[in-house]
């Protein structure tokens, strides 16, 4: 199984990156936290979780081992697959996730698309003790240094990313209307603003 990849970034989008490793392009699914940390181009190293299904082999990549550990912890829960685990990590940073699990904060957990009250309860029940043992403090804050794009292009990318995370179109349009999208705002900055509003 693939556990680590280092290569040149051939393509980067909010939900995946293509890493060119010695002429072979690997499509790696990533959470927003990893997207924020990756450069637009150049070399990158990702900690990989390989998911083998009947019809596909999918790679999920993370900037830190701790983030990967949280992902693996999430998929150990019945009913949480790799895509939903990635979406959870796209909506809430590991330190906040650990705190929500330890405090039994069902409201915060069930605010994540795809997580209902019963799933939130199951997450707390199964992961409350385990989450505290992971070193969530080693995860970077994720300050984004992104490319500047025309506002229309930024909003299109953000809208697409939010819909991919499970938010409904009317919800996304409402949030995008509230955002402050200055001409110099990057996709990363606008995504962070949108997720803050959606997680209230």
UniProtKB/Swiss-Prot annotation:
It comes from the Bacteria. Keywords: Cytoplasm, DNA damage, DNA recombination, DNA repair, DNA-binding. GO terms for molecular function: ATP binding; four-way junction DNA binding; four-way junction helicase activity. Residues 153-200 are annotated as: Domain III. SUPFAM superfamilies: DNA helicase RuvA subunit, C-terminal domain, Nucleic acid-binding proteins, RuvA domain 2-like. GO terms for biological process: DNA recombination; DNA repair. Residues 1-63 are annotated as: Domain I. It is found in: Cytoplasm. One of its GO terms (cellular component) is cytoplasm. Pfam families: HHH_5, RuvA_C, RuvA_N. The keyword DNA repair applies. Residues 64-142 are annotated as: Domain II. Residues 143-153 are annotated as: Flexible linker. Belongs to the RuvA family. The RuvA-RuvB-RuvC complex processes Holliday junction (HJ) DNA during genetic recombination and DNA repair, while the RuvA-RuvB complex plays an important role in the rescue of blocked DNA replication forks via replication fork reversal (RFR). RuvA specifically binds to HJ cruciform DNA, conferring on it an open structure. The RuvB hexamer acts as an ATP-dependent pump, pulling dsDNA into and through the RuvAB complex. HJ branch migration allows RuvC to scan DNA until it finds its consensus sequence, where it cleaves and resolves the cruciform DNA. Homotetramer. Forms an RuvA(8)-RuvB(12)-Holliday junction (HJ) complex. HJ DNA is sandwiched between 2 RuvA tetramers; dsDNA enters through RuvA and exits via RuvB. An RuvB hexamer assembles on each DNA strand where it exits the tetramer. Each RuvB hexamer is contacted by two RuvA subunits (via domain III) on 2 adjacent RuvB subunits; this complex drives branch migration. In the full resolvosome a probable DNA-RuvA(4)-RuvB(12)-RuvC(2) complex forms which resolves the HJ. Has three domains with a flexible linker between the domains II and III and assumes an 'L' shape. Domain III is highly mobile and contacts RuvB. This is Holliday junction branch migration complex subunit RuvA.
